[in-house]
């Protein structure tokens, strides 16, 4: 089972945002897998990295799990739309968001304990931001969906090692709902191949459901 799919983009996108849209996308591969794409679109009257914006996101993927000695496979799609209040300065940035998500999860066999089964709407809130301190950057993202009680918390610390925006660091993730929980720890590389574009790659391990597995995550954001 997966928490919200807004992972790498939520930390990379706002930092690059101007008074023009930012587009982002990426994917996550472990025993489960998913891909996402979205945009951060400033509303009229917004200043660079300040004011109101909307953030649509679409994602899809698959996962499997075990329930009462039975293996269950799931395919899902998520459509999200949030209203975002952006604040920024030399200190870093902070985004506060609230919105709605439509999700549709198809299970290979019925599971009454899986709240995600079928199509449903849910309200959600999130916060993300970063603090700059010289070559160091400490950032985080947290979200919560009310109906399925889904939570996702991600933190990272990176240090710039090259003038072209190359940063190295660590990330940690905690996610779950009443039926599962997972914890991840990985190494992170972020770089800017061109002005306004950032690529992020993280590799690590994830523990949950009495097993441990490796994961790979890739994110891309581009401001215009």
Predicted regions and their residues:
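Short glycine/proline- and aromatic-enriched beta-strand/turn motifs that initiate or cap beta-hairpins
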Residues: 14-68, 215, 222-224
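Short loop/turn motifs that connect adjacent beta-strands in outer-membrane beta-barrel proteins
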Residues: 16-20, 43-53, 88-94, 132-137, ...
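Outer-membrane beta-barrel proteins and related beta-barrel translocases across Gram-negative bacteria
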Residues: 19-31, 37-44, 86, 99-103, ...
